[in-house]
A protein has these predicted regions:
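N-terminal (or domain-start) structured segment
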Residues: 11-105, 146, 150, 159-190, ...
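Short coil/turn segments
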Residues: 27-29, 86, 117, 122-127, ...
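Bacterial N-terminal signal peptides
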Residues: 1-6
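A conserved helix-loop-strand patch within extracytoplasmic ligand-binding domains
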Residues: 104-145, 161
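Periplasmic solute-binding protein
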Residues: 89-97, 111-126, 155-160, 245-251
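Short, Asp-centered acidic motifs that coordinate Mg2+ and/or phosphate
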Residues: 79-82, 118, 140, 187-188, ...
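Short amphipathic alpha-helical coupling segments at ligand-binding clamshell hinges
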Residues: 35, 129-132, 257-268, 277-281, ...
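C-terminal lobe and pocket-closing loops
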Residues: 114, 196-272, 320-322
Length: 322
């Protein structure tokens, strides 16, 4: 029996006259959106035919909606790529309702950056250490909802390290959380160090705690795992930190045409080494730390390879949604 497998349509060796769509799992203004727009500006330069590029924001369910779209609806013709919450791999691991993708089957371009996750407080508040914060009752933290680092990082600190937080979800982007903080609607926020650093530099917020991923300027902050009071808490925090090694993932749909995928991968790597992109990123205080598609898949496999008891425990504390 001879089987003929249908392949994705291919249009040859040029993107001339085409437009690349970059799907983003969050609304405009947040970190994922900023990286997508930076990539959209420089990626076409390294694709034959110099195509156009547009960003399509598709928020919802902490990026699960966008990931589902990229996996099963977007055409695998090389004209659609996307970026979504790095923690979607945890959503797949714990079998979150609504997940209809397999991250191992995406056509990976890689990641634009790794990043630390930090917890910060407003600088006008008197809290300067983790121990100061432990003494506060109902410290108010704005979040973009379960499944995001803005939510899960403080939620795990509350569960396993003795903090008393009042988490306020529902903000549609990290930029909206920061606006709430500036208006003093909330006392603090967590999330990507890269996204929060400009506000640290401005003196708006003060970093207090980080995850195991470090970066210049926050090396001496206490690590969440070291504040946990149980082995279970330390383990969950450790596993939850793994995806931050691919904090800004970029993928194409599964079965993307091989010739187009090779061009996209090459262009992605070259764009992230472009001197003008790097200068613009530095000006915008955005870290660029290219991760290859092969290494990104290794990180995904590491998370998805957790034993059943760890998965069961993670599922108790990590949720996804708005």
């Amino acid at each position: 029996v001879v089987l003929f497998l249908a392949s994705a349509p291919s249009y040859g060796a040029t993107f001339e006259g085409k437009t690349i769509t970059i799907v983003v799992g969050y609304k405009p203004g947040g970190g994922y959106d900023r990286y997508a727009r930076l990539i959209a500006k420089y990626l076409p330069k390294y694709l034959p035919g110099n195509p156009g590029a547009v960003v399509q924001n598709m928020p919802g369910a902490s990026s699960v909606i966008a990931a589902n779209y990229l996996y099963s609806i977007a055409k695998p013709d090389g004209l659609t790529i996307g970026t979504f919450n790095n923690a979607t791999v945890v959503a797949q691991l714990i079998k979150v309702e609504g997940v209809r993708f397999d991250l191992t089957k995406f056509a990976w371009l890689g990641s634009a950056a790794s990043d630390a996750v930090i917890l910060t407080v407003r600088s006008d508040l008197p809290y300067r250490t983790a121990e100061d914060l432990r003494k506060v009752k109902q410290f108010v933290i704005g979040t973009t909802g379960p499944g995001s680092s803005t939510h899960d990082f403080p939620a795990l600190l509350e569960e396993f390290a003795g903090f008393d937080f009042k988490l306020v979800p529902g903000y549609s982007s990290s930029a909206d959380v920061m606006l709430a903080l500036e208006r003093k609607e909330v006392d603090g926020r967590a999330g990507s160090y890269d996204s929060i650093k400009p506000f640290i530099d401005r003196g708006l917020v003060r970093p207090i705690i980080r995850n195991r991923t470090s970066a210049p300027g926050i090396e001496k902050l206490p690590v969440d795992e070291n504040l946990a009071t149980s082995a279970q808490g330390k383990l969950i925090m450790a596993v939850n930190a793994v995806p931050t090694q691919i904090y800004r993932p970029f993928v194409a749909p599964p079965a993307t045409a091989k010739d187009a995928l090779k061009m996209l991968r090459d262009a992605f790597a070259k764009a992230l080494n472009d001197k003008d992109l790097l200068a613009e990123a530095e000006k915008g205080k955005m870290t660029i730390d290219y991760v290859s598609p092969e290494h990104a898949l290794k990180i995904v496999a590491e998370v998805l390879g957790q034993p059943a008891d760890v998965v069961q425990t993670l599922a108790k504390y990590i949720k996804f949604g708005d």
